[in-house]
From Swiss-Prot:
Record-given protein name: Probable protein phosphatase 1N
Gene3D superfamilies: Phosphatase 2C, C-terminal domain suprefamily, PPM-type phosphatase domain
CDD domains: PP2Cc
Any GO molecular function: magnesium ion binding
Amino acids binding Mn(2+) 2: D96, D267, D310
Domain of life: Eukaryota
Family from the record: Belongs to the PP2C family.
Required co-factors: Mg(2+); Mn(2+)
EC number(s) per entry: 3.1.3.16
Keyword Metal-binding among record annotations: yes
Binding, Mn(2+) 1: D96, G97
Amino acid sequence: MAAFVRLLERLGWAARAQQVVEQEVEEECSVPGASGSLLAAPRCWQRLHRGAAATSGLRFGASAVQGWRARMEDAHCARLALPGLPSGWAFFAVLDGHGGARAARFGARHLPGYVLGELGPAPQEPDGVRQALRSAFLQADAQLSALWPRGDPGGSTAVALLVSPRFLYLAHCGDSRALLSRSGSVAFCTEDHRPHRPRERERIHDAGGTVRRRRVEGSLAVSRALGDFAYKQAPGRPPELQLVSAEPEVAALARQDEDEFVLLASDGVWDALSGADLAGLVTSRLRLGLDLELLCAQLLDTCLCKGSLDNMTCMVVCFPGAPRPCEEAISKEMALDEALSHKVAELYASAQEPPGLNTVFRTLASEDIPGLPPGGGLHSKAAVIAEAYSKLHQTPGECQEEEW
């Protein structure tokens, strides 16, 4: 772990420098109370979560990491069964707080209950369920408003998956995203709610607000969120027509046998990898037979190595049609890990002085190495490289550092 953290420190230096510049430029339009400060080293400990439902064939894994941020403001929830509904209904959500974790934690704790209350015992699919999800988000936001300390800033984006035996419902507000992989490719991906999108800009203007620097009132980067009640004060307008709205955009997708998985993630993940890259990386890890929570942990490690500075949470929900473990893929992965370890040893032995870990990584990055994981490339193998390096470059103090 210590070697991996040191590698992240080196690889993240340029990204952190750019972040400081951006903060200086945008200081006058930042959200009050926003937690933009960065740590000297990332906190890489990950919180893992997994579950499975034998009757429906659903299984999920999730992981969350604080990363470079001074505070952890993400939250998530998973309900593999919904009381009062038949087998096969399930609910999952990832929430990304800003200006504090209060809104994200509230949503993770209470949103499933509001969804269940709005669905009732006999949901009408798909239109009735879509409306139930909209109402549940708005009701949760109203209750959050009643409990919110007056004048406090902060809010949370959210992305949710509601599974029924016939449909997949993807509901989101803000820039936490979801994608569906079907037949080996991305079949659907949500679109971020940004103030410059025509529909969002029109609502903001109609509510008496402005969009400056691609932000609501020059400050908030998303146009839909739970919380952010300072932007929900336009008189005479319903909650869904305020400058910032908690009404989610809801897609209803008929289920198919070819459905493989849905990935839900906060924006720190999407900052580092595209939807196609994420789908390819998840697919390749599924073929290795990884437990889903460990798959998510590897994905977040890859994003950290690619320079993401945000809190990150990802959740993978697999359906019966998900890629299965493949002996050939497992053998190739083992051979790749062995080859990378051998290359690290060669670089170490050929240098006049012991090379730094960052030098080793960048040297390998300049080479054409076959068989690297699709989507993640060499960054998804940083832990393997760091482990091989640490075996060659251990110092007396390193053993203690490993326990950090």
